Amino acid sequence: MTFSLLEAYNRLKETNAALAARLLEEAEWGVEFILKNRYGDGYRASSMGLLIWQDGVLNTLDDIHSVRVQNLAFDNFLYAGYETYAAMTIDRDPMLQEHLRKVAEEDFSFATEKFKKDGFDQFKQMYEHSYNTSHSQYMATISWSASMLYKLTGKSCYAETAAEAIRYVLDCQRTEPLKDKGRTCGFFYRDKSRKSIVHYIHQSREQVYMQAMTLLCETQKEHPDYQKWSNSLKLYGNYLKGLMKYTQPYGMVPSGVYHAEEYKDSAGFYSLHLFPPANAQELYTEQITRGVKLDKEHYLKRFPVWFSIFNGNTAIHLSTGKSAAICGNFLKDEELLNIGREQLYWTVGKNPFGQSLIYGEGYNYPQMNTFSSGEMTGEMPVGIRTLGNDDIPYWPQPGTKLCGA
């Protein structure tokens, strides 16, 4: 959230000073929170479970003691990138800027040492959004974070790390067309084994692949691998363009391509599908076959495959929409930029239900199931979902809607 606020601030600071100032103020609270939960030795408070609205007073009955503290290389790579971006953005506090630069380099160093020692993290907290992190997403995150630090410091070691990490990601991208009429390609697999394709449920980090590629192209234009990075962007952009015909006349970007037997990658399958039913593999097959068959092994799904309470499509299509916008800006491709815009249009009412999904914005926005905070202007739901094993939108009436997020 802090990173998004800072991105919005940079976008608006020249055109809407008042709104930009509020965005920066909120972002600075976020930066303070990030720094307070960093212990300076690789460990940090990573998350907590909370289902009540607390009184804000220490040592009372509603205190929560379930804070999860971990030393994960992935977390430190990710936060190093965020801290770096904050250091490049918050220019009204030189002392904070210098501190952010210092901790960003420290956190990246902690992450690098742990990654060299232990390899990919073993994610154990299933309620954290990192639990489903694939190896390709992991390496894209390393590359993006390293490029951020290179942009800030100019140190060649970060440029080298960024270029090296992305090679793994490129090896995970599908470049050979499927055997469908559209010759679909450009999507990413979870790892080099290519047993399963990158998917998300309930939350998404899809945009990190394109963030990493574009930042490499921006910061290392003379690198021998520049054309590989640029071509990766074009492949992925064409992949997104090819998806859009499956949701016409609406502009919601589909979930993407699925292999018929992704459940055989048991580690990836069960890190994605939390609390799956005993017949999850059979349900997987049922759900993908209700999508669009592309060839003997692949199907196109408009909505993700999902089995449990962890569903809702808002984060998924908005993240992919951000990927489209990133590609569109780099490639100067208006069709991709429009795909990004369509995800916003869907969110504010250009959907089959004619409802804005943002409380207080647009028309016909629904009541949310916000059981602890009450209704708040600007709140968004987890999103439109499907009914049973179908692959069409389902949006139940107020009182049974997904929890506001």
What residues fall within each predicted segment?
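Short helix/loop segment immediately N-terminal to the Walker
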Residues: 15-18, 93-97, 117-131
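Acidic, Ser/Thr-rich low-complexity linear motifs
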Residues: 121-133, 176-191, 196, 360
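Aromatic (Trp/Tyr) and acidic
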Residues: 8, 52-89, 129-164, 192-242, ...
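Active-site-proximal loop/short-helix segments
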Residues: 49-56, 114-126, 137
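Conserved helix-loop functional segments at active or binding sites
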Residues: 10, 85-92, 113-120, 148, ...
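Solenoidal tandem-repeat scaffolds enriched in leucines and small polar residues
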Residues: 77-96, 103-109
